[in-house]
From Swiss-Prot:
Protein name as annotated: UDP-N-acetylglucosamine 1-carboxyvinyltransferase
Membership in a protein family: Belongs to the EPSP synthase family. MurA subfamily.
Gene3D superfamilies given in the database record: Enolpyruvate transferase domain
Taxonomic source organism: Prochlorococcus marinus (strain MIT 9301)
Lineage, top ranks: Bacteria, Bacillati, Cyanobacteriota, Cyanophyceae, Synechococcales
UniProt xrefs under InterPro entries: Enolpyruvate_Tfrase_dom (IPR001986), Enolpyruvate_Tfrase_sf (IPR036968), MurA_subfamily (IPR050068), RNA3'P_cycl/enolpyr_Trfase_a/b (IPR013792), UDP_GlcNAc_COvinyl_MurA (IPR005750)
Modified residues (2-(S-cysteinyl)pyruvic acid O-phosphothioketal): C128
HAMAP family cross-referenced by the UniProt entry: MurA
Residues annotated as binding UDP-N-acetyl-alpha-D-glucosamine: R104, D319, I341
Length: 456
């Protein structure tokens, strides 16, 4: 079995068996956005009142984040895709390493804990192995707000400086438009004293979703979605009910899968302007895109090569670079894919070449000559988006493919294979019962088998 990383090995606890040369047809329901839900869970720490989150996807990352909040003292009740969170009895301001390991989003807790309680201890974050994602912007921004920060033995220890009880609003200019830093600083500044301005802020839809929920809670945040965000700190925040926005990355993945298989599908619900960079490139490459309300329909017969360069929103999302590389690998003509966000996000290239692609990699640029077909293989995905790219490749390929490393896929796609089945793809999840024995959390294509969040 070929592994997505030459330096790592993965337990083959679960894999997907894909019968190739499939076509997609029908309507697929898009789940709530993982990257939004994770930060909204952290934001619930900012109030003592109840927060109700709707449209929360059932994913291993969400379960990990919920367990982190429970450990802090948050009471969580789940029903279907709805979470009720009660943070009034938080007694711990420290996140244990064993719970945060592998979940980068755990670091979001530092802003709310510091701003609300004046102290926080959070391990350095983990996540997908796609290169360096430093937290310098988070740390420098929190220091500017009045935090004293010490990093010892991979633990970030933060306190409010001196005898002050609150962070103090200030002007912060980010060196780069970091999504995580923007979100961390917005949450921290929402309970700070005075006005905070964040320049060169990230503009991603998930940030806008966070600001919308915080404003429902009583925050005073202006101009989210713009390069300069203004936050007037308030004394306290209240509870609210909020629906997580649709996942634009999941939506884009299905659109790309449809284009790669010359298929026609409709995705819904979506927010079309969140997907503009993707749909524009799909249209440029030969797909017909029809937008109607909160749905997008794609029809595709022939694909031609087009160039893309990843960029912060509203540019082409880095999270869809790997799936789009798969599409370009079977397009007519040549194309060039340039990754500008992460330095190690081309793990899929040598695997696609094993399947028959013709891709030459020069640092962060993939030069692609389209081929007519792929051949099915047994492969292991090394990260979340590589796994999605390989599944699309398996659907295109002649013969059968087996994709392992599903612990990555299950972090970011809710019931991915069952949705593909609904669209007509022959795909089966296989379990290694011996390995699964000690697993606390698993995802199944059968909704009845999906573990519920326990009431705490």
């Amino acid at each position: 079995m070929i592994c997505g990383s030459k330096n790592k090995s993965y337990l083959k606890s679960q894999n997907l068996k894909i019968f190739g040369q499939g076509k997609l047809n029908g309507i697929v329901e898009i789940s709530g956005a993982k990257n939004s839900a994770l930060v909204l869970l952290a934001a619930s720490l900012l109030t003592n009142e109840r927060i109700v989150l709707q449209n929360v996807p059932r994913l291993t990352d969400i379960e990990k984040m919920a367990n982190i909040l429970r450990n802090l003292g948050v009471k969580i009740v789940e029903k279907n895709n709805r979470l009720e969170l009660d943070s009034q009895n938080i007694s711990i301001k420290e996140l244990p390493y064993e719970l945060v390991n592998g979940l980068r989003a755990s670091f979001f807790c530092i802003g709310p804990l510091l701003s609300k309680f004046g102290e926080a201890k959070v391990p350095l974050p983990g996540g997908c192995n796609i290169g360096s994602r430093p937290i310098d912007e988070h740390i420098n921004g929190l220091k500017a707000l009045g935090a004293e920060i010490l990093i010892e033995e991979e633990i970030v220890k933060a306190n409010i400086k001196g005898d002050k009880s609150r962070l103090i609003g200030t002007h912060i200019k980010l060196k780069c438009p970091s999504v995580g830093a923007t979100e961390t600083l917005i949450m921290a500044a929402s309970l700070a004293e005075g006005r905070t301005t964040i320049e060169n802020a990230a503009r991603e839809p998930e940030i806008q979703d966070l600001c919308q929920m915080l404003n429902k809670m009583g925050a005073k945040i202006y101009d989210s979605g713009k390069e300069k965000i203004i936050i007037d700190g308030v004394n306290e925040l209240c509870g609210c009910s909020h629906k997580v926005i649709p996942d634009r990355i999941e939506a884009g993945t299905f659109l790309i899968a449809a284009a790669a298989t010359s298929s026609s599908i409709t995705i819904s619900p979506v927010i079309p302007n969140h997907l503009e960079a993707v749909t524009n490139k799909l249209q440029e490459s030969g797909s017909k895109i029809t937008i109607k309300g909160n749905s997008i329909t794609i029809n595709c017969n022939k694909i031609k090569g087009v160039d893309i360069e990843t960029a912060p929103f509203p540019g082409f999302p880095t999270d869809l670079q790997a799936p789009f590389t798969t599409l370009m690998a079977i397009a007519n003509g040549e194309s060039k894919i340039t990754e500008t966000i992460f330095e190690n996000r081309m793990n899929h290239v040598h695997l696609l070449n094993k399947m028959g692609a013709n891709i030459k990699l020069n640092k962060n640029i993939a030069h692609i000559k389209g081929v007519k077909k792929f051949k099915g293989m047994d492969l292991v995905g090394s990260d979340l988006r590589t796994s999605a790219a390989l599944i699309i490749a398996g659907i295109i390929a002649e013969g059968t493919s087996t994709i392992s490393g599903l612990e990555h896929l299950d972090r970011g796609y809710e019931n991915f294979e069952s949705k593909l089945k609904i669209l007509g793809i022959k795909i089966t999840r296989e379990f290694n019962k011996k390995t699964l024995k000690n697993k606390e959390f698993k995802t199944s294509s059968d909704p009845a088998d999906i573990p519920r969040y326990k009431a705490a």
